[in-house]
């Protein structure tokens, strides 16, 4: 889908660049596949702020997207493509031959009327799902499982994909968008193709108010606060903080490595950080 620009009738319109969604379904989502969604405002179950600068925003209904695609060898027809406010990608409503409906992540080049199917050995075409070990090397995939049967976790946002670059015994080698290469078990499943809406990265929000509609509040820097509020705060006039960047709680930030999951390090063949050196 193309990008939309607008006549500069206001400063916000002048800057605004949106994805043209005219080809998407304009009605309401399927009620049986949606749930109510309460705004958390960045608070956890105790009412304390756990994520700063969140709150407000437009009311949203959550669409239950099927990331597992567990219905094997039952063809489904794509009924329509829809907008989903909860993610950057578009979603597709599919209807199985037995009448059941489901939402899936829409890949690029998936059109209304197409047939998709999940199974052990299926055609290599967008939207079909099968184990990574049964796909040819070089296949572009999305919505990839990291644990067998858990449901897709990798390459789910707009325009993303992973590529199968090799095999190693029971595992396949995946190259991710970040540049990381990692081992994923061959029985983990993935959907063929790249995720829809690749133009999302070229959009421009245009004005602060549109960000507020998305539920994001103004972000305040530590150096403009008082010493009671932030380690970088205080000082006469403008200061640079006077120390290496830290969070409001004094922990190093901006490049400090925080990964502690050593048990899965053996599955990472090439780190995403190696590419930047």
UniProtKB/Swiss-Prot annotation:
GO cellular component terms, alphabetically, are: large ribosomal subunit
Query: Which top-level group of life is the source organism from?
Result: Bacteria
Provide the residue span(s) of the region labelled Disordered. 223-277
**Record InterPro entries:** NA-bd_OB-fold, Rib_uL2_dom2, Ribosomal_uL2, Ribosomal_uL2_bac/org-type, Ribosomal_uL2_C, Ribosomal_uL2_CS, Ribosomal_uL2_dom3, Ribosomal_uL2_RNA-bd_dom
Name the Gene3D superfamilies for this protein: 2.30.30.30, Nucleic acid-binding proteins (2.40.50.140), Ribosomal protein L2, domain 3 (4.10.950.10)
Q: Report keywords, A-Z.
A: Ribonucleoprotein, Ribosomal protein, RNA-binding, rRNA-binding
- What assembly does the database describe for this protein? Part of the 50S ribosomal subunit. Forms a bridge to the 30S subunit in the 70S ribosome.
Protein name per UniProt: Large ribosomal subunit protein uL2
Q: Which organism is it from?
A: Nitrobacter hamburgensis (strain DSM 10229 / NCIMB 13809 / X14)
Q: Which gene encodes it?
A: rplB
